Amino acid sequence: MSLSFSLLKPPLSSSNPNPFLHGTTTKLSLLPSFSALSLSSSPPSSSTTYTFPVIKAMRSMQGKVICATNDKTVNVEVVRLAPHPKYKRRVRKKKKYQAHDPDNQFKVGDWVQLDKCRPISKTKTFLAVAPEGRQSSATRPKPIQAASDELGIPLESQVEGDKTV
């Protein structure tokens, strides 16, 4: 007998029978005891420690910034692989999302991670953050200009009019 059925069924032996099926005469003593499941105010014993895993309902998406002209908004293209309904081959599917960029730190071509947040506007429900593994253009170090002597061959601009005709 399930718990929901026992709650919906009227008690068999009642001193005050009620003609209604779902009357208000249900006594707390007739309900099953949940003392084993309820949380008590006393701390649990040291032998039993309860750790609940953090449940993240939606995995965060990663994509590439394709437009950053709007203020505090970036347009991100997310590419995912999904099976084709008929041919069962994995096909790339692209979708564009508007994401909130409060500091205008992302430029076109940067990889960002989209985290779900409260709706900021009609189309913006994601927050753009820098992923841990990748570097954005703001945090990427500038490449060092290579010296022209690296090849060992002087450039034409470095040769001083040493031309023979």
Swiss-Prot record:
Coiled-coil ranges from the UniProt annotation: none
Transit peptide location: 1-57
Chief location of this protein within or outside the cell: plastid
Domain of life from the UniProt record: Eukaryota
Keywords: Chloroplast, Plastid, Ribonucleoprotein, Ribosomal protein, RNA-binding, rRNA-binding, Transit peptide
CDD domains linked to this entry: Ribosomal_uS17
Keyword Nucleotidyltransferase carried by entry: no
InterPro entries: NA-bd_OB-fold, Ribosomal_uS17, Ribosomal_uS17_bact/chlr, Ribosomal_uS17_CS
GO cellular component annotations of the record: chloroplast; ribonucleoprotein complex; ribosome
UniProt xrefs under SUPFAM superfamilies: Nucleic acid-binding proteins (SSF50249)
Region Disordered, residue ranges: 128-165
Cell location: Plastid, Chloroplast
GO BP annotations, alphabetical order: translation
NCBIfam families to which the protein is assigned, alphabetical: PRK05610.1
Complex formation: Component of the chloroplast small ribosomal subunit (SSU). Mature 70S chloroplast ribosomes of higher plants consist of a small (30S) and a large (50S) subunit. The 30S small subunit contains 1 molecule of ribosomal RNA (16S rRNA) and 24 different proteins. The 50S large subunit contains 3 rRNA molecules (23S, 5S and 4.5S rRNA) and 33 different proteins.
HAMAP family reported in the protein's UniProt record: Ribosomal_uS17_B
Family: Belongs to the universal ribosomal protein uS17 family.
Function summary: Component of the chloroplast ribosome (chloro-ribosome), a dedicated translation machinery responsible for the synthesis of chloroplast genome-encoded proteins, including proteins of the transcription and translation machinery and components of the photosynthetic apparatus.
Protein name: Small ribosomal subunit protein uS17c
